[in-house]
Regions:
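A short SAM/SAH-binding and catalytic strip from SAM-dependent methyltransferases
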Residues: 101-115
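Conserved class I S-adenosyl-L-methionine
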Residues: 1-38, 40-49, 141
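Conserved beta-strand signature within the Rossmann-like core of class I S-adenosyl-L-methionine
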Residues: 130-137
Length: 143
């Protein structure tokens, strides 16, 4: 997949994307994820999009870092969640043992298979001992 094209798409359609995703109810998935976290967990919302999930985790008392590759989505997510959102590509994750949980909801699916392997390794390095990752992908036979 072409990272520049993907980011350009999200920059051009950020408001429409936010409007289409901000109200999606992920309550049952959130519950499964947070049930495996310590009370004072630090979470990375990796590819935070609208900031919907960041806002939820903050409302539950977690420390949250949010990041996205689209500058436009970073701005909208920051407004919605009320925290600064870091503009970065998935490939630029270099944290080591910083997070108890990494939430990558419908985000890293945009990576090529080769980039996905590298990014998953970086995500694992960014986890503290007993840390967990949530990610979601689309069905398909494409890369």
């Amino acid at each position: 997949m072409n990272t520049a094209k993907t980011i350009d798409y999200y920059n051009k359609h950020a408001q429409t994307f936010v409007e289409g995703t901000i109200s999606v109810d992920l309550g049952s998935i959130y519950a499964q994820f947070v049930s495996r976290l310590p009370d004072s967990a630090r979470i990375l919302d990796f590819g935070c999009g609208s900031g919907r999930d960041t806002k939820y985790f903050l409302s539950q008392g977690y420390m949250v870092d949010a990041a996205d590759g689209s500058q436009e989505l970073c701005a909208l997510a920051s407004q919605h969640a009320g925290i600064p959102v870091r503009h970065m590509l998935f490939q630029d994750l270099n944290d080591v043992q910083r997070y108890d949980g990494i939430w990558a909801c419908s985000s890293i699916l945009h990576l090529s298979r080769a980039d996905l392997k590298v990014v998953l390794e970086k995500m694992i390095r960014a986890l503290r001992e007993r840390g967990i990752i949530y990610t979601s992908f689309k069905y398909g036979t494409f890369e």
